[in-house]
């Protein structure tokens, strides 16, 4: 009898647990939707609300997802104006103010809330497949690290879907916390690292409708790759992403466009670095010429008031060092990978002229001191 009771209890609990599955986040959803409108003007306040009400990663990401899916409306007027770029803050601010946006705004907001809630998260760019064909538009979604695993989230698709150039609204959680192996059946990221798969699909395999990699494949440790990527500066991240994309098989038109975008991002960074080096070199020159003029005034005043000889010699040495530092910076500019190079010729000329004049004054000073 006791044995039968145990079996009954086991079956009852199993059935009850399965029945309650859809309501697992019911309370989380209610709390997430109870946030006052005064706390939804920015993602920092939304994240603070979430952190004050939930203590697990799964509930935090659910609350963020629920809020986004229920409070950000799809902006159908901008259906064909998806701009894939790197400025997440601008995407977030624009959409939060209007409480509307397109996929990149949904992804940016969810990612921003998750990050500010203490979760590791990425907004991912790519394209999708549905009804047997690849969509011609770009798309964006999210990845969040929850309970030691990466999961994918697409709040845009749970708000509605595109079909034949039109957006049809709906509601649900079909694209909440989906496993990478399932998500790849409909979503292809430009960067294969963000498939979160040990054996990523090529772009061709995705286009042909395969749900997993075929043929002989090389193991890809995406966990280590993501960890290493987080430590890189943006320029190196772009370079690494471009290499991963180029190694992932023949690119589609959309992938080729992404590669061009990455190259443009790199070019902008190269040019920014060059501009900083150039401006710093000019600043060094201005300081050096200013110090040199003060030395000449001191000389013209018959080296009065008197200073230690070593101090006067050190002044000229310091000016030469400023000139040398400026020259080194200009050399780096000339070795730049930027397509649009800065012309350093004029600055190099005045630096060389100044260097010659300083060295002449060093000779004069030595001769002057030897006869004094």
Question: Where in this protein do the model-derived segments appear?
Answer:
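Hydrophobic/aromatic-rich core segments of domains that either
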Residues: 66, 106-178
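Active-site rim recognition segments
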Residues: 78-82, 90, 145-223
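Mixed-charge, low-complexity segments
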Residues: 23-27, 49-50, 163, 193-372
């Amino acid at each position: 009898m006791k044995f039968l009771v145990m079996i009954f209890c086991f079956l009852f609990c199993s059935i009850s647990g399965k029945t309650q599955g859809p309501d697992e986040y019911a309370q989380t959803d209610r709390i997430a939707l109870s946030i006052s409108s005064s706390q939804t003007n920015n993602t920092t306040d939304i994240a603070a609300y979430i952190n004050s009400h939930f203590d697990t990663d799964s509930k935090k990401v659910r609350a963020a997802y629920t809020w986004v899916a229920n409070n950000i409306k799809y902006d159908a007027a901008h259906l064909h104006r998806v701009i894939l770029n790197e400025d997440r803050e601008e995407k977030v601010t624009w959409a939060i103010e209007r409480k509307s946006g397109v996929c990149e705004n949904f992804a940016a907001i969810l990612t921003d809330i998750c990050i500010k809630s203490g979760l590791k998260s990425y907004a991912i760019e790519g394209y999708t497949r549905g009804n047997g064909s690849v969509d011609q538009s770009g798309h964006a979604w999210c990845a969040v690290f929850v309970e030691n695993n990466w999961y994918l989230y697409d709040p845009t698709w749970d708000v509605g879907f595109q079909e034949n150039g039109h957006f049809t609204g709906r509601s649900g959680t079909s694209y909440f916390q989906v496993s990478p192996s399932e998500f790849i059946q409909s979503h292809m990221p430009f960067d294969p690292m963000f498939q979160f798969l040990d054996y990523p699909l090529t772009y061709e395999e995705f286009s042909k409708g395969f749900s997993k990699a075929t043929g002989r494949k090389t193991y890809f440790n995406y966990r280590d790759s993501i960890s290493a990527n987080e430590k890189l500066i943006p320029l190196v991240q772009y370079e690494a992403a471009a290499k991963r994309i180029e190694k992932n098989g023949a690119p589609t038109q959309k992938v080729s466009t992404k590669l061009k975008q990455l190259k443009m991002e790199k070019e902008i960074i190269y040019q920014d670095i060059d501009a900083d080096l150039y401006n710093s070199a000019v600043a060094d020159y201005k300081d050096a010429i200013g110090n040199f003029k003060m030395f000449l005034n001191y000389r013209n005043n018959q080296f009065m008031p008197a200073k230690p000889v070593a101090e006067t010699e050190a002044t000229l040495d310091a000016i030469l060092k400023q000139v040398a530092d400026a020259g080194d910076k200009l050399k780096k500019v000339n070795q730049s990978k930027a397509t649009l190079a800065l012309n350093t010729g004029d600055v190099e000329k005045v630096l060389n002229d100044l260097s010659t004049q300083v060295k002449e004054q060093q000779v004069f000073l030595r001769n002057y001191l030897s006869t004094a």
